[in-house]
Amino acid sequence: MSAIVDIFAREILDSRGNPTVECDVLLESGVMGRAAVPSGASTGQKEALELRDGDKSRYSGKGVLKAVEHVNNQIAQALIGIDANEQSYIDQIMIELDGTENKGNLGANATLAVSMAVARAAAEDSGLPLYRYLGGAGPMSLPVPMMNVINGGEHANNSLNIQEFMIMPVGAKSFREALRCGAEIFHALKKLCDSKGFPTTVGDEGGFAPNLNSHKEALQLMVEAAEAAGYKAGEDVLFALDCASSEFYKDGKYHLEAEGRSYTNAEFAEYLEGLVNEFPIISIEDGMDENDWEGWKLLTEKLGKKVQLVGDDLFVTNPKILAEGIEKGVANALLVKVNQIGTLSETLKAVDLAKCNRYASVMSHRSGETEDSTIADLAVATNCMQIKTGSLSRSDRMAKYNQLLRIEEELAEAAYYPGKAAFYQLGK
């Protein structure tokens, strides 16, 4: 009764008003699974291909009708009749049907939409929530959120090069408390920005985008906002950065417009170390350019015992590239973005590889999101203990947080919130 009888995709819009792919998978039992695919702004060179139409007469060339057609024709023909519980087999069929390393024929937005919709349909058919279907029985951790409260880089029109300044409520006793902590700091930050004459418009991920003079000024604002909300930075909340360094790495140097300076990789590692010494920063994502392996090695040697160093553009959720990074001893955590690799099975393989090598995993959204909340279930199913899904505004971000609230409620005593234990790889 769990055989696939129909697969249908459509073009919908994401949180930036750009087209993306949504897919429905119908099973013989009458159950349907639906999933929608996110899209990134700052993307890694080795990410799986997001197939766009290129027709400038529609959505400035960003339409996804080709990807939709691939789902409704080649993929549907290959998968109809197969048991939806055979997730790995289904994903492998799509990988072979595409025939490229980067999903360049079918498009990762086509394969991922189907992969996630199949999992949702199979979970529904089994009478299980998605996190239980994928994660099995037993206790599960709710993730510590990385809440993006100040935006820079490609996510905002300001002078800050570092793309995301985030708070992590590690002192909370539950996810519900952590969410309240983040929301209260977010609103305190808004009042603080107002009082200083900064605009309170928000960036793609819901954080504020004030035109500050330096990265230190952004971090100091976060300290003040935490205190104004009744929390202590360094105890109740820790900070996290997403440098997205590939966006300002040119000609072998890191160019910081906000600072008016350029740095070699060794100098930029020292710059980041200076921020860590001055502020309670526990996590730095993409602290070096994705191709600057020497810089990553320097940064890992300098900070890898006390700070989580997350590879996003560096690893692009690709098990092969992650394995290379593990072998070279760079970074100590993996950012997990399902659309970087294009299937659920490959995503889970990357998370498993990270765990086996004591690399932490951070489940992540993209800057272009939808109301789809699959990553919330994935964060719990994989027990990855961290999630990055934006600020405390915009319903596309809140959809994930609200789903985590529901999951915590459903799990009750079987749920736990790890707090600082989420950074288990540090000090190893």
From Swiss-Prot:
Name of the featured protein: Enolase
Xref: CDD domains: enolase
Primary gene name: eno
EC number assigned by the record: 4.2.1.11
Cystine bridges: none
Positions contributing to Mg(2+) binding: D242, E285, D312
Pathway annotation from the record: Carbohydrate degradation; glycolysis; pyruvate from D-glyceraldehyde 3-phosphate: step 4/5
Family: Belongs to the enolase family.
